[in-house]
Amino acid sequence: MQLSQNETNVDAYEVPAIFTSLDLELNQPSGKIIQIGAAVGRLMTGDILETFSCFIKIDEPLDEQIIKLTGITEFDLASGLSLEEGYLQLASIHIKHKAFMNPIVWGGGDSLAIRHELESRDPDFFKEHNFCFGRRWIDIKTIYQMYRFANGLKMQSGLSKSLGRFGLQFKGKKHNALDDAVNTFRLASKLLERLKD
């Protein structure tokens, strides 16, 4: 899937309408990706247009603590996709909706983790396939912390507690990449309302 720059994202100088919220679950201690979750939608309205989730096959045992934390099992991973297949499906959805190039994340680095792991598996992967995301990301955790700081409030907060402080409940299961991506999108939309002049 080789795409031109115009196909991979919207113009960086336009006000973007659609964003991709991205979340990963990782095995430990290796940090290998075991699940990709994404929600694509209109941030100004909070409308989610499409979601995506897949488990990723890995070549190592799944850590017991990660099984307890995420509920992901060896069976889930065995029936999953390769990271390459998972990325290409994610990229297809991101591009189809012409989402802004920088994904929304909780805590930063998820898009970079995908890129680095793909490059470590196949240094030529991005010679055949464009990377669908930009070099940056929109870290909702940091923006939320600055919002709290500006209002003289405690800055430390997890995703679920942060949603609660805006009158929202966490939907789904914590440490599920899709549910975390959807809830990060919901918080980003609510936070955007509060930041408008």
Please describe what each predicted stretch is:
Residues 2, 17-18, 85:
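Feature recognizes metal-dependent phosphohydrolase scaffolds
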Residues 20-23:
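Short hydrophobic beta-strand that contains or immediately precedes a catalytic carboxylate
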